[in-house]
């Protein structure tokens, strides 16, 4: 195991336009970090640079006490798990898991021992004699993880490993990856576009956008205190409600742009200090914080539709030219055309600068 250091990492393919812009992060020995963001944000490129599959234009990558910029992937002491399982169809599970060690010249007894240990961890022991075509998608992904485990690397790299699995298997494999990390405590970097994977697996999340690390922090901190409009809108399902508008001179109301209502926002932390009154802002509030509750300021939301999700419902409406979503308990399902008293708890309101996109306060 080893710490992983990324200092000033930049990537350009043509020497002019950069696709990664000065990524700086220190990943502790044994830490599980998730790179999350939309397609094209640079997360997979960064992972490939750590692996040695892409060159570093500027900056330094260190694994443990070794700078690895100039090292081949095989010399970096890393193991990768890919979206595609990349199993040899003519080999058994045991042969697939041990093949990487075999071509490195590791003695047979050591290979057998490591394969047996990994198979026990991943509950693959009954499947060792089978070939990939005889396995389910989840079993194949466990074999791919087993192949990485037997290398006993300093760093695990996961490149969207659950993307090919159905929803039920993704939940199962997330739990298995959590248990695996708890048992092995190996430094891990995991790439995904799925925020649920990011929030449930990570000790720290790096939210990527257009080649920048928009925010780095514990999942709960990123969720509860997003630093930019992008993070606020990307993390969370459904996303945070974001509304452009103007804060009144007395800081008591927020007039939603596009003919929306004047929302009661008095008492929100920072108003009058870090949040200047009498100017434009982007107001954010999460759907679950708008659930009607006694003693909390409310605003009327005309309901356009209501989605039944099982344990709860999502009521949809509009304020001005902004779509608004409110999460409701299972028993509350307002009909189309009715008015919902959407809560606006002052301590749950977020304000962002409309020009820079950065959080106020």
Curated annotation (Swiss-Prot):
Chief place of localization? membrane
Q: How does it sit in the membrane?
A: Peripheral membrane protein
Domain called ABC transporter: residue spans: 4-235
Q: Which UniProt keywords apply?
A: ATP-binding, Cell inner membrane, Cell membrane, Membrane, Nucleotide-binding, Sugar transport, Translocase, Transport
Catalyzed reaction equations: sn-glycerol 3-phosphate(out) + ATP + H2O = sn-glycerol 3-phosphate(in) + ADP + phosphate + H(+)
This entry's Enzyme Commission designation comes to: 7.6.2.10
One Pfam family cited in the UniProt record for this chain? ABC_tran
Q: What GO cellular component entries does it have?
A: ATP-binding cassette (ABC) transporter complex, substrate-binding subunit-containing
Q: Name one GO biological process term.
A: glycerophosphodiester transmembrane transport
Concerning its family, UniProt says: Belongs to the ABC transporter superfamily. sn-glycerol-3-phosphate importer (TC 3.A.1.1.3) family.
Q: How does it assemble?
A: The complex is composed of two ATP-binding proteins (UgpC), two transmembrane proteins (UgpA and UgpE) and a solute-binding protein (UgpB).
Please state what the protein is called. Answer: sn-glycerol-3-phosphate import ATP-binding protein UgpC
Upper lineage is: Bacteria, Pseudomonadati, Pseudomonadota, Betaproteobacteria, Burkholderiales
